[in-house]
């Protein structure tokens, strides 16, 4: 998993509340267990017209936001059914950070496990960031995970909080497998000690 220390990129505004996982990645895209290629299905029902052509009115299809790295979204983002394909699709599209006033718990935790930083802010701060994100190609935010700070295009900053363990994992690029490998020496020592004390096992 790639480390997340500091991210600077265009932020796309998506002022819609209760965006569920089916909206993030429709069920038609859940047949694969590969993490790559799902970016094409991200927000598919909103991004594409019935004939499969891009919907020019959807924010991520607009030229200024096609390479967005940050999503500023409405309340209760990621609600609905549990599907890890949702953060996979966001990540495959290129989005490494989602900012909202609240997230569904399972989606929130899945983001950290897949290298995405979900940030919870107040409604007042979200309104400010949504306004910043509406500036098109000038909607550049910097997310500093070490400093726990968001810096807007006007230089103003907003502080945020993240669980210390989750922050450690993102800063060091540690997913569940990485965390296990980090304890490799301790595991080896335990197995050797067990083999010596219980040779019959």
UniProtKB/Swiss-Prot annotation:
Subunit structure, as described in the record: Heterodimer of LeuC and LeuD.
Organism encoding this protein: Sinorhizobium medicae (strain WSM419) (Ensifer medicae)
Transmembrane domains' residue ranges: none
Pathway: Amino-acid biosynthesis; L-leucine biosynthesis; L-leucine from 3-methyl-2-oxobutanoate: step 2/4
UniProt similarity note: Belongs to the LeuD family. LeuD type 1 subfamily.
Molecular function via GO: 3-isopropylmalate dehydratase activity
GO CC terms in record: 3-isopropylmalate dehydratase complex
Gene Ontology annotations of biological process type: L-leucine biosynthetic process
Protein name, per record: 3-isopropylmalate dehydratase small subunit
Function: Catalyzes the isomerization between 2-isopropylmalate and 3-isopropylmalate, via the formation of 2-isopropylmaleate.
Record-listed E.C. numbers: 4.2.1.33
PANTHER family in the cross-refs: 3-ISOPROPYLMALATE DEHYDRATASE SMALL SUBUNIT (PTHR43345:SF5), 3-ISOPROPYLMALATE DEHYDRATASE SMALL SUBUNIT 2-RELATED-RELATED (PTHR43345)
Catalytic reaction list: (2R,3S)-3-isopropylmalate = (2S)-2-isopropylmalate
Entry-linked InterPro entries: 3-IsopropMal_deHydase_ssu, Aconitase/3IPM_dehydase_swvl, AconitaseA/IPMdHydase_ssu_swvl, IPMI_Swivel, LeuD
Family annotation (HAMAP family): LeuD_type1
Top-rank taxon: Bacteria
Keywords: Amino-acid biosynthesis, Branched-chain amino acid biosynthesis, Leucine biosynthesis, Lyase
Enzyme class: lyase
């Amino acid at each position: 998993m790639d480390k997340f220390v500091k991210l600077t990129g265009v932020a796309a505004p998506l002022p819609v509340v209760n965006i569920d996982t089916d909206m993030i990645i429709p069920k038609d895209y859940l047949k694969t267990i590969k993490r790559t290629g799902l970016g094409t299905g991200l927000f598919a029902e909103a991004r594409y017209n019935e004939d499969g052509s891009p919907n020019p009115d959807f924010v991520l299809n607009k030229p200024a936001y096609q390479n967005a790295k940050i999503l500023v979204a409405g309340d209760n983002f990621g609600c609905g059914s549990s599907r890890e394909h949702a953060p996979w699709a966001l990540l495959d599209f290129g989005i490494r950070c989602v900012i909202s006033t609240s997230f569904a718990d399972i989606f929130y935790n899945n983001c950290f496990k897949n290298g995405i930083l979900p940030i919870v802010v107040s409604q007042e701060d979200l309104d400010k960031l949504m306004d910043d994100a509406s500036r098109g190609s000038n909607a550049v935010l910097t997310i500093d995970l070490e400093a726990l700070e968001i810096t807007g295009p006007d230089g103003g900053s907003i502080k945020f909080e993240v669980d210390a363990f989750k922050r450690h994992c993102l800063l060091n690029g540690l997913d569940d497998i990485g965390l296990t490998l980090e304890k490799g020496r301790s595991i080896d020592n335990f197995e050797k000690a067990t083999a010596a004390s219980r040779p019959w096992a």
